[in-house]
Amino acid sequence: MKRFFLLIVRVFYSSISLIFTLLTAKLLTRDDYKQSVELIVALSIMAPIVSFGIGPLIVRKGKCSTQIAYRRALNGWCLGVLLSLILGLISYWLYPDIYIYIFMLLVLNNTSFIISECYRSQNDFFRALLFSNGSPSSGVISLGIISNFLFLVLCAILFLLKIKITFSFLVWGTICSILITVLYDFYKNFIRFRLRITNKWLYIYSKSGFNISLIYFLFSFISNSDILIISHLADQNIVYDYSLAFKLSASCLIIHTFFASMSQVEFVKNNFLINLAIKKLYFTSISVSLLVIIALNIVGVYVLHFFGVYPHNEHVFRWVILIKSLGAIFYIALGFNASFLLITNRFKNIIISCLVFVILFISVACLSYVCGVGGWHSILYSWLMSYLVYSLLLFLYFKRKGNYNG
């Protein structure tokens, strides 16, 4: 029953991302919509810098009292708020109209992720997965999914009734709907602990957290590298079509994170070995993801039409969602067990795979441009080729060095 509930939460999160995108596409001009895409990309890339590995640091310190674990978490949260403030000021220079949204959402992401990892340190995986899927780079994923989903559905109804709503209302409503779900847990768990940041703690924290932070930053860059470049180089119509396809194709990966998270729990319980339960979750993940991908490629554009959103160029939309879907299913098929590399502390292997992606992506994009394949085509094809190599490397690393028997 708990697993089913968590799966529903993942479906809600996928719906939230889609509804938010569709509402902004209807509310904003193409130029403003392009800026909103830049906001989402900026959040995705900055979030792991803020989290800075605090969660895994808490878990990997071994058995300790709840008081010590939560004091460490409070230290990390305060440091995360400071980093959010610094990034918020940088965002003001880059995005003067939306920097306050970036700051608030970074703090929320930091809060929900740290609460999640505190529960994880107590082996309360159900609550941990409610507050986060274990990845600080995935934006604000928390128990606020349900309240945020209800808020966005309300916004959609208001829009259909032709009641005027604004982008600011949409973002602040999202922030508040998530905030109400994390305030109580934060107050309950952290208010009685004192902040105690020392030079020794900062050294240990930085040494332990840097690798995790770098990995999640690279994960985020890999997921958003194409839309990051497209949003700054392409014209607003291409950004419009590309981002719509990007959001739709991401649905299968969001569902996949549920099965991957459940598998990590089984992996730890089974002394870091692949058992039958993990294999079942693996095949279920592939099956569900494949069905979602097929459905998205067939009816994706009609889903947009149903909500009154029409791509500027339907050919661009369909081609992007097809290529992104191919990359997603390849990663799910090969990279599913590779997620265990994080648990087994194989940081070096993960970082090498990520850096190979970055180098290959930049190299292929430049080569495509030299060969005359310019614009969004070269970025999309470069991403796909690099993503396939990246997924294959993760698979080979785990099969060669991990406890892999299937």
PLM feature spans:
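Short membrane-interface helical motifs at transmembrane helix boundaries
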Residues: 24, 82-102, 291-312
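Membrane-interface helix-loop junctions in multi-pass transport and translocation proteins
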Residues: 25-35, 90-101, 126-129, 133-181, ...
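Alpha-helical transmembrane segments of multi-pass membrane proteins
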Residues: 43-49, 86-89, 95-119, 172-180, ...
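Helix-loop junctions and terminal segments of transmembrane helices
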Residues: 48-66, 249-273, 342-343
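Membrane-interface junctions at transmembrane-helix termini in multi-pass inner-membrane proteins
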Residues: 60-61, 110-142, 269, 326-355
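Interhelical loop/hinge segments that connect adjacent transmembrane helices in multipass membrane
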Residues: 100, 129-142, 163-223, 269-276, ...
